[in-house]
């Protein structure tokens, strides 16, 4: 994968870099003026760009494309800015399906806070130890807040058990499509992601946790994107470690 920044893009932003991430979370960052290509194994790749204008204290992160990389292919991403309309455009080589992507990079859009998550009923850095077959006493939920409005909520799952149930490794909870039935069947519940999405939504893992067996970890990672294309600064990760239910008999 190669990245190209036009002069208009370079003049509009004081600092910038592109990031290509694999579905496993490995990342390669293309810093300013980097012209070398990076090599990736075939599979899903996620392209993001980090930008900051002069005078801004924080950078903005945009998810620009998710695509399937094939063996022996070279992919070129070109970043440009139409200064008159304050629009950032990202175009792709013919190997990547889809038209160019456009983002509002006006001061109002750049100053809008990125989406963020709040955990309820669990601590992100601590594995959640559930009892196999029992619903947690407290609700285990994740709240997403996007001031500009929610565009998508991406759930990445690492669980051999759920994979065997045809549960998707990656799914947009705002548009689950064919996976909606299995998500519901296994107990995952959402509010605020259906139909006309607003600023807040909830992902409820409580009933899903009841159905998870012992024998390892089940990892769920959430990432949100707002209507401007900004992504949450930090993904929210829930790690569930079910324990067996043992009874002592006198």
Residues covered by each model-derived region:
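Extracytoplasmic cysteine-anchoring/structural motifs
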Residues: 1-249
């Amino acid at each position: 994968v190669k990245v190209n920044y036009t002069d208009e893009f370079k003049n509009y932003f004081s600092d910038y870099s592109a990031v290509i991430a694999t579905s496993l979370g490995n990342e390669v960052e293309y810093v300013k003026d980097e012209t070398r290509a990076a090599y990736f194994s075939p599979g899903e790749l996620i392209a993001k760009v980090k930008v900051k204008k002069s005078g801004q204290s924080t950078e903005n992160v945009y998810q620009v494309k998710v695509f399937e990389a094939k063996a022996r292919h070279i992919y070129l991403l070109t970043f440009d800015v139409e200064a008159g309309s304050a629009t950032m455009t990202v175009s792709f080589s013919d190997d990547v399906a889809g038209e160019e992507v456009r983002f509002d990079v006006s001061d109002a859009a750049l100053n809008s806070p990125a989406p963020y998550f709040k955990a309820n009923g669990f601590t992100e850095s601590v594995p959640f130890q559930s009892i196999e077959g029992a619903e947690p006493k407290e609700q285990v939920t994740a709240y997403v807040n996007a001031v500009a409005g929610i565009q998508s909520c991406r759930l990445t799952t690492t669980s051999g058990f759920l994979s065997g149930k045809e549960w998707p490794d990656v799914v947009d909870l705002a548009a689950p499509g064919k996976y909606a039935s299995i998500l519901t069947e296994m107990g995952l519940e959402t509010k605020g992601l259906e139909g006309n999405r607003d600023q807040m939504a909830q992902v409820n893992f409580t009933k899903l946790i009841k159905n998870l067996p012992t024998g390892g970890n089940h990892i769920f990672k959430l990432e949100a994107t707002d209507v401007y294309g900004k992504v949450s600064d930090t993904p929210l990760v829930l790690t569930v470690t079910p324990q067996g239910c043992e009874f002592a008999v006198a």
